[in-house]
Amino acid sequence: GDVYKRQSTFYFEFIAVDNNNQSSEISKLIVNKGIVNYSRELKFSNLKCVSRITGAEINGTNGLPIVEFEVNNRTNELYNVGGTDLGIVWELQPGHYGLFFGDTFGSDFYPNFVNPGPNGSNWRSNVLLFSDDQDLSDGLTINGATMDESGKNAREICYGGKDGSGNGDWTSIPTAAIRANGIDYVHYMNIRNWAGWITNFSSLYKSSDNGITWTRCQNVKFGSTSNFGQVSYFKKDGYIYMVGTITGRDNKPHLARFLEENIENQTEYEFWNGSGWIKGNETAATPLFNDISGELSIAYHPEFKKWILLYFNSTRYDISFRTADHIIGEWSKPQKLVDGWQYSQLYGSYIHPISLKGNILYFIMSMWLPYNTYLMSAELKCNP
């Protein structure tokens, strides 16, 4: 194919290698201007909505289309999950995935054209469902949940106070999840007031029994104006990389990292300031690029040797797609992965780990109407 070149910053890259001959992305040193080859840019095509993951069949209810996307699961009947959003997915054990959902309502939930979004009874700030599905081409199958004592309801994991006054503990919303050293962690934001996405703090819960019981990690806490109030995690070369923003959808992404064993030791977190890693000083972090983002999802694709970042952009009203050879950049310009004018009231774009095998990108997207989650797919291809 044609090779496209442009003047850009040229980098020397220094790679640290540990005793197991594993490399670690640690730094890039800017030395001069040069020519960078952009011929192997990662592109996507053939975007599809594969299926709806959560909620009941709609079939014309409240004016919605008679034929909607196929629903793979009866979450309203089996787990009392009628309306929900997000679907942050990670791998607990090989082939066993957890999916964290946000504010969740029971089987009496119904999509409402006049006032879309949450409604109904049995409000839980978050729930955790499970999937062992290895073939997502026909949809994502849910086959379990962390249930309450009655065995009838998926239970709340991260406590939310349900105080809608705007001056207390409104709800607790998951933003990312990961397994580190055999323990599963969820990062969440504790919402004080949805007007302005004001939080009390962000923190972690952890589980040592594959997602059945969870406890709060009291020693990890991010303030209400932290650049890591909402995050996405990815493990690579012994590190967990954390891309985050101030809570909301109007802020630029920042980058941190820590060794896997230090996830509960916040003093060991390192923050990227544009030229190096700064330990223990969160305010040193500088933006990865100049673009506002919400509901980030980061992953490294080993076959394409590319980092992939998905996020909601409110200005363009889309799910944006960026790539980079190294997580510290240089990041590609945003591509429009999903158009909000085609999928109205869209948000969230959480990459399924199964995407990192092969050339199909699977991600979970939400729509405010009908306030449920969808499995999306796109084909990936690198320019030759």
PLM regions and their residue ranges:
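Short, small-residue-biased leader/transition segments that mark boundaries at the very start
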Residues: 1-4
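Asp-box/BNR beta-propeller loop motif
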Residues: 19-22, 207-215, 324-333, 383
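Extracellular fibronectin type III
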Residues: 21-37
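N-terminal regions that are enriched for targeting/export leaders
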Residues: 36-180, 186-189
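Structural signature of eukaryotic scaffold interfaces centered on beta-propeller domains
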Residues: 83-92, 166-182, 227-238, 292-303, ...
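Conserved Ser/Thr-centered positions that define the repeating blades of beta-propeller domains
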Residues: 89, 131, 207-208, 258, ...
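Conserved blade-ending motifs and adjacent loop-strand segments that build the rim/top face
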Residues: 331-355
